[in-house]
């Protein structure tokens, strides 16, 4: 059995976006230190009062550079919003950077279709 955390990179009332990113990265680094196996990243668009996580693959690359063991999963990457070749190249690159720790989860999203740009 594996244990992990689901992270949305929540915004904070009291701080800047940079502070919210720093806090989230610190939580993930702590999760690795505590022995958790995986961090799952959401993809959340058009909701800046809730989450900063609009680019989970970019964040996954940053996590890969900051950690050594914890697996990094997308839960979920919204396929209709990305070009297939670009997604394939980015995921392959992050998997190499992370030493094979990327778990690429895809889905349709919970976005209202009217809100998709």
What function would you assign to each model-found segment?
Residues 2-19, 80-117:
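Flexible, glycine-rich active-site loops centered on histidine and acidic residues
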Residues 1-66, 70-71:
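N-terminal beta1-alpha1-beta2 module of alpha/beta enzyme domains
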Residues 73-80:
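The substrate-binding groove and active-site-proximal loops of carbohydrate-active enzymes
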Residues 42, 75, 105-107:
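Structural motif
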């Amino acid at each position: 059995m594996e244990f992990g955390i689901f992270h949305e990179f929540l915004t904070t009332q009291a701080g800047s976006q940079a502070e919210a990113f720093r806090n989230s990265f610190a939580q993930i680094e702590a999760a690795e230190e505590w022995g958790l196996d995986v961090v799952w990243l959401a993809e959340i668009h058009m909701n800046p009062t809730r989450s900063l996580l609009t680019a989970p693959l970019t964040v996954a690359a940053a996590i890969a550079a900051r950690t050594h063991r914890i697996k990094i999963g997308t839960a979920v990457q919204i396929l209709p919003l990305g070009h297939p070749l670009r997604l394939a190249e980015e995921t392959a690159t992050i998997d190499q950077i992370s030493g094979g720790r990327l778990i690429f989860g895809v889905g349709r999203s919970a976005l209202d279709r009217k809100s998709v740009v």
